[in-house]
Amino acid sequence: KKSKDYRHNFSILIILFLLISTAMFALLPIKSSAKKNDKSFVSYVENESFLNAEGRKILCFFDAGCGHCQQAAKSLDSLSLLNESFPSVHIIFSDTEEEKIPEFFDGITNEYQYQVIPFANYDTDEIDSYMEITFPDYDNPVVILYDGSRQIRLYEGTSNNEFNVEDLARILYK
């Protein structure tokens, strides 16, 4: 009889422990260890004239060795030649192929302002590298149209949301 009472009490104790443990994990918030990017893309730009520019402007995230990125840059350049009121363009490159930046601009008429940031920097708690800003949500090339500080259109990758110069022209000159 005592053995059954101990077994019964032990079973109740185990059930209570499991219920409390489950309730604890369900009700207490779990802190994510991943870095969260709450900043706007434009906040990573280190060009005051671009940041302070009123009106439309275009921010690009490119890799210097990326063929799709170079094609997007050439398309932007061609579109800019068609209209004098084309927005200013600022490019952020990753440092993985920094030595290819001069040849990236071969065949491009305009001189675009650009900056280079580290490809990856997981040693800090800050979001301060190309991968942390763009990955995993966005693929190269990333082209973003702003009106002042308000994002109007974001193109990225090479699939459904890829950069489309005709779509950009329609938005700019409608």
Where do the protein language model's features map onto the residues?
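Thiol-/selenol-based redox modules, centered on thioredoxin-like
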Residues: 11-13, 25-26, 81-84, 151-174
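Internal/C-terminal transmembrane anchor helices
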Residues: 5-32
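Short, glycine-anchored, charge-dense loop/turn motifs used at functional sites
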Residues: 66, 146-153
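Alpha-helical transmembrane signal-anchor/signal-peptide segments
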Residues: 32-46
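Short active-site neighborhood of thiol/selenol oxidoreductases, capturing the structured segment around
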Residues: 49-70, 75-76, 88, 92
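Thioredoxin-like thiol-disulfide oxidoreductase module
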Residues: 96-140, 146, 168-173
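Short acidic, S/G/P-rich loop/turn micro-motifs used as interaction or catalytic elements
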Residues: 65-68, 97-98, 159-160
